Amino acid sequence: MVRIRLRRMGMKHKPAYRVVIADSHAPRDGKFIETIGHYNPQAQPKVVFIKEDRARYWLSVGAQPSDTVVRLLKNLGVVDAEGKLIGEAPAKVEAPVKKAKKAVSKAAVAPVAVAAPVKAEAEAGEFAGSVRPLADGSAPEGYAIKGNQNSMLYHVPGSRYYNSTVAELWFDTVESAEAAGFRAPGQKSAE
């Protein structure tokens, strides 16, 4: 079960709390799903900040507030004394839903455009000897070396990570991959 509760912060003898969404079995200061506010009972006046829209959302999907959080939410006007939601979510949320329903109904009536045929050829990459993957993600003919632009690594068939790598570029030879600045996994960069 998901709970809305307080997570203790602050120093010894000076507690401050974060209002968090957490699993009911998680420890008090353990892992949590989301922080929706904070509460400082030591400050004068007491500081309470809770994101009402997120509190309403979590209450609407079944999160159970602790007794202290019920009191804080009651003071903010989000829940009644029993912890039940007061009123509905803001009307701003309903307007996009109505617009989306209208758009869906118009789309159902509107004629469907025919998609352009998929190119059988791959687009040339930024580097010599490289091409982009085909539309289905497969390798173009003659290109077997996968290149990952985020890590600047290339993977040859049969290497450890070849099957798990998603190719962002395909190279025809190892030399063209290295000329483009890519390196084999396990090698240190030249920097």
Curated annotation (Swiss-Prot):
PANTHER family: 30S RIBOSOMAL PROTEIN S16 (PTHR12919), SMALL RIBOSOMAL SUBUNIT PROTEIN BS16M (PTHR12919:SF20). Transmembrane segments: none annotated. Pfam families: Ribosomal_S16. Disulfide bonds: none annotated. Keywords: Ribonucleoprotein, Ribosomal protein. GO terms for biological process: translation. InterPro entries: Ribosomal_bS16 (IPR000307), Ribosomal_bS16_dom_sf (IPR023803). Belongs to the bacterial ribosomal protein bS16 family. NCBIfam families: S16. GO terms for cellular component: cytoplasm; small ribosomal subunit. GO terms for molecular function: structural constituent of ribosome. It comes from Herpetosiphon aurantiacus (strain ATCC 23779 / DSM 785 / 114-95). The gene is rpsP. This is Small ribosomal subunit protein bS16.
